[in-house]
Amino acid sequence: MADVDNRNRNRRPNRAGQPNPKREARAKAAERHVATVSETCAKDIERSLAGVCEFDGMPAGFIAAMKAKAHAADAAEEQVAEESEAAEVASAETEVAAEPAPAEEATETESAPAAEKPTPVLPEVTVFDASATQTILDNGRGYAQFCDMAVLAFASFTNPGGGYIQGYLGQEATLCANSYLYNVLDKQRKWYGENRRRNINCELYRNRALVVPAVRFDRNHVHAYADVIVAAAPNAKRARQEYRVGDDALLDALRDRIRFVLAICDELGREKLVLGAWGCDNNGFDAEAVAELFRKELASGDFKVKQVFFAVPSTRWDEDFAKFEHVLASFPECNEESYAQVAARAAAARAAEQAQAAAEDDEDDDDWRKYL
């Protein structure tokens, strides 16, 4: 843990001007956790600190792969054009030939199949009603040297751990609470300072990320390792309110950030990736739109990841899990119905069932007046 006094950080008043006891309790628990893991996981922390790497813009390997893919596509189009031209020439020569080709040969020539494009290998996509930590523990490996998984931390662009040490909640804070992630991020204050000074970009932020390698996650005496990709989604809520950024620009920024994260996973060579409702809720993006962006990119065939786990815990105050499940149920195909249409139909069916049940109850009620 950095030599910084955090004791008074968590005493920020709430909106009513009073301290927040629950947040203060979480802040104290966070301080205890950070101090404990700094001793018990000292070697792991040292190893992860030594391996931290920064990404500023798309990884070079991904850019090269996209250029090679575009070149191959152009070459394939040229080949098809040349074959088509050759076929036309051959057809013209056949027409002026003295003897027509036998019927069987002509049939075989006409039915010759065109060259097919190779089918891209797409990942297996699953949506879990679980936290990212639980998904890592259920699907990760227990040895750092065999780590084959990466997890996306829904990061704060300017604050290590997303306010975890101040007692704030969130996906990144939960990851910190079950690992030594904060101990590593707290040492990267130069990177966060650079983000604050130069890269806010109308609250859209930029394609900048940290990767903390092979972080150990623990819960209930079970542990697993995963690389943590620390990247921030655009803050749509602030971008709309403070800079009048339009919806199309917001979605374009998020799409580019999603490609950035998937490209980093490719660069790391990890076969498994834990994602989630990134950019939703406090950041202001609709979960259905976010899920659709993820679906399009994962179905594009541009990425090498083999298994993608969407960890989206269901809650009482949002429909993120239901929306992600709806959009990705037919992966890689697009779901033709919107979530609103499906939800409206389900609500109408429930209302009809309730009305029918109420009518049956009325019919069964015996009129007491006939016994007078």
Stretch-by-stretch model annotation:
Residues 1-372:
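Macrodomain-like recognition of ADP-ribose-binding/processing modules
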